[in-house]
Amino acid sequence: MSRVCDITGQTKSFGNKVSHSNRKTKRTYLVNLHNVTLFSDVLNRKFRFKISSRTLRTIDYKGGLDLYLLETSSRKLSDKAQKIKKMIKKATAENAKVSL
């Protein structure tokens, strides 16, 4: 079971544990992952993700999954998130054609 965020691709990072006497020992920082179900308003569909707390807070701040994916650069997103972003763009383009 890999500890990778499904949307951002964030993985564990490395650093040092520093003691009071300033000795440094290597350590890893794991990603705080949560299993969540997010709803896409444009696609009218639910998606299951394993995402980090930081990503979840950012999605809430941006106003939902659709707005987060559309405003975020594709190079910062994982392959799974890029596919969903492409589906959202396609659906919004079709809705724009229908409303004309």
Swiss-Prot record:
GO terms for cellular component: ribonucleoprotein complex; ribosome. The keyword Ribosomal protein applies. It holds the Pfam family Ribosomal_L28. The keyword Ribonucleoprotein applies. GO terms for biological process: translation. It comes from the Bacteria. GO terms for molecular function: structural constituent of ribosome. Keywords: Ribonucleoprotein, Ribosomal protein. SUPFAM superfamilies: L28p-like. InterPro entries: Ribosomal_bL28, Ribosomal_bL28/bL31-like_sf, Ribosomal_bL28_bact-type, Ribosomal_bL28_sf. Belongs to the bacterial ribosomal protein bL28 family. NCBIfam families: L28. HAMAP family: Ribosomal_bL28. PANTHER family: 39S RIBOSOMAL PROTEIN L28, MITOCHONDRIAL (PTHR13528), LARGE RIBOSOMAL SUBUNIT PROTEIN BL28M (PTHR13528:SF2). This is Large ribosomal subunit protein bL28. It comes from Ehrlichia ruminantium (strain Welgevonden). The gene is rpmB.
